[in-house]
């Protein structure tokens, strides 16, 4: 589950992605229910649609049930772009908070708003400096939608096929990533300004092309775009 919470200088925008843990999601929405917040919630298309509108009375809540999201697949990036773009079109948010439906705020809304108002326009995005992610993006991972399937034996077969395919690409020195940007990795959850969201959206076409066969590219593309800007 992913959620985007947005705000207009004093109104925040929350983008949420969700697929289960409905009780936690319900609690999250209640804690975010503040007139200064706009909440954009995407529920995985594989999951049953649940209307949480009755749980939110002060914030503006927008619920979407559009994309079949698969672990490690380009669909994770697609749903993030969907949320960023939908919120950006409304515009005038000082911060876009991309969070999981399993997250809960540890501070009150007054404390959270005061913190981000005091630190604007700082970008809050994590970088795992000791990790390398080149092989995640440089190589083509076959059957990216099926990196985690319920059939244990099928998982093993697909894992072996992917490993063999990557081995051949290494042998042939094949590099799928054609951009000059240095690849960077970090957590997918961020709190970023409208300026950064605009920059990310301007790269949509090339990101969808370059990350189509990547593994867990959602942990790479935002850090790479912002880190190289």
Indicate where each model-derived feature is located.
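Single conserved hydrophobic/aromatic residue that forms the stacking wall/gate
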Residues: 1-11
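Active-site beta-to-alpha loop of glycosyltransferases that engages the nucleotide-sugar donor
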Residues: 16-24
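Short, acidic, metal-binding catalytic loop of nucleotide-sugar glycosyltransferases
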Residues: 27-38
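Short beta-strand/loop segment that forms part of the nucleotide-sugar
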Residues: 37-48, 65-66
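Active-site-proximal specificity loops/subdomain of glycosyltransferases
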Residues: 56-93
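Short aromatic/hydrophobic "clamp" motif used to bind/position activated sugar donors
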Residues: 96
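Conserved donor-nucleotide/metal-binding helix-loop-beta segment in metal-dependent transferases, i.e.
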Residues: 106-141
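Catalytic core and acceptor-binding pocket of nucleotide-sugar-dependent glycosyltransferases
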Residues: 159-229
């Amino acid at each position: 589950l992913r959620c985007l919470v947005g705000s207009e200088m004093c109104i925040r925008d929350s983008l949420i992605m969700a697929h289960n843990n409905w009780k936690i999601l319900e609690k999250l929405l209640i804690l975010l229910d503040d007139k200064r917040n706009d909440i954009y919630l995407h529920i995985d298309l594989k999951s049953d649609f649940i209307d949480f509108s009755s749980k939110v009375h002060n914030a503006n809540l927008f619920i979407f049930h559009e994309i079949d999201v698969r672990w490690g697949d380009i669909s994770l990036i697609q749903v993030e772009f969907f949320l960023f773009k939908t919120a950006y079109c409304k515009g005038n948010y000082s911060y876009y908070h991309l969070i999981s439906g399993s997250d809960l705020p540890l501070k009150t809304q007054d404390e959270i708003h005061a913190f981000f108002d005091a630190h604007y326009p700082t970008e809050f995005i994590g970088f795992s400096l000791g990790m390398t992610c080149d092989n995640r993006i440089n190589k083509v991972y076959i059957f990216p939608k099926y990196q985690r399937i319920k059939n244990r034996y099928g998982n093993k077969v697909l894992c072996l096929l992917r490993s063999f395919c990557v081995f051949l690409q290494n042998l042939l020195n094949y590099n799928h990533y054609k951009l000059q940007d240095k690849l960077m990795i970090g957590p997918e959850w961020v709190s970023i300004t409208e300026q950064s969201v605009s920059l990310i959206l301007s790269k949509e076409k090339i990101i969808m092309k370059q990350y189509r066969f990547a593994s867990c590219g959602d942990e790479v593309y935002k850090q790479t775009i912002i880190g190289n800007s």
